[in-house]
């Protein structure tokens, strides 16, 4: 179980597959501890993929005396990449948090980044997104993890999928399980998300960028993702018309993989 001491903390990480280096990051959770499940199908066949636990998640440690910010989580990744000797990495940020980390890495260390993918992203929070994120955190704190889990799942999945898969989405082994009995980390992740603001710096990103818009996303809709496409010089944008906050189901996953690999293959 690799654990790296970087940026005054300890990060758990895994590397799957072979090929050009890539990093895959999600939202308030982790792609680790799943034998590569959850990653885009075929990604580890073509790329050497790094996944890691954000500080405070699972086996990564955190220092609560350091204020949480997207720049802090980006500095963790930068230090990990430097320790591994990785450069010219494809950064794949999905479902919120990972996008902000990728943006900050692309801004501060463009030498590390070969391309960047953002989906479920924002450059800064408006009142609507701020209140959503605050409400998720408040429900967790005041009512408990399982109420939060149900609440966030209702916002993140389409009704048809939720109705058919509620038994898998909810419960101890359900979604966002990394935050169960871990409110403090959730609080800090939300702090980082609320404070994230690259609106005035997007023009400085020189990395080839793809922004994927999820037309039915009730959290990070095209309202928050389109400004990133428009703000980064030369960025490409693709809309998935039938997708909510999380890509689910065979058809959506195939569509997502086609979009992702079409972009990565060009860079």
PLM region descriptions:
Residues 50-92:
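Active-site loop/oxyanion-hole signature of alpha/beta-hydrolase fold enzymes
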Residues 103-107, 114-143:
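Flexible "cap/lid" loop of the alpha/beta hydrolase fold
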């Amino acid at each position: 179980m690799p654990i790296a001491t970087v940026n005054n903390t300890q990060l758990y990480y895994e590397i799957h597959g072979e090929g050009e280096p890539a990093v895959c990051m999600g939202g308030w959770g982790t792609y680790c501890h799943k034998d590569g499940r959850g990653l885009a199908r075929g990604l580890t066949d073509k790329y050497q993929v790094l996944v890691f636990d954000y500080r405070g998640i699972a086996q990564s440690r955190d220092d609560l005396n350091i204020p949480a910010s997207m720049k802090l989580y980006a500095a963790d990744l930068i230090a990990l990449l430097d320790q591994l000797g990785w450069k010219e990495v494809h950064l794949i940020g999905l479902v919120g948090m990972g996008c902000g980390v990728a943006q900050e890495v692309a801004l501060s260390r463009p030498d590390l980044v070969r391309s960047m993918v953002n989906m479920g992203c924002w450059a800064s929070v408006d009142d609507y997104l701020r209140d959503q994120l605050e409400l998720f955190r408040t429900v967790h704190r005041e009512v408990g993890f399982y109420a939060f889990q149900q609440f966030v799942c209702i916002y993140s999945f389409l009704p048809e999928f939720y109705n058919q898969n509620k038994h898998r989405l909810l419960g101890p082994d359900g979604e966002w399980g990394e935050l169960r009995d871990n409110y403090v980390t959730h609080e800090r992740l939300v702090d980082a998300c609320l404070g994230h603001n690259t609106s005035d710096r997007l023009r400085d990103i020189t990395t080839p960028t793809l922004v994927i818009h999820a037309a039915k996303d009730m959290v990070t809709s095209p309202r928050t993702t389109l400004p990133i496409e428009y703000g980064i010089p030369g960025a490409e944008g693709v809309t998935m018309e039938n997708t909510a906050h999380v890509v689910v189901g065979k058809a959506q996953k195939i569509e997502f993989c086609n979009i992702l690999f079409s972009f990565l293959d060009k860079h």
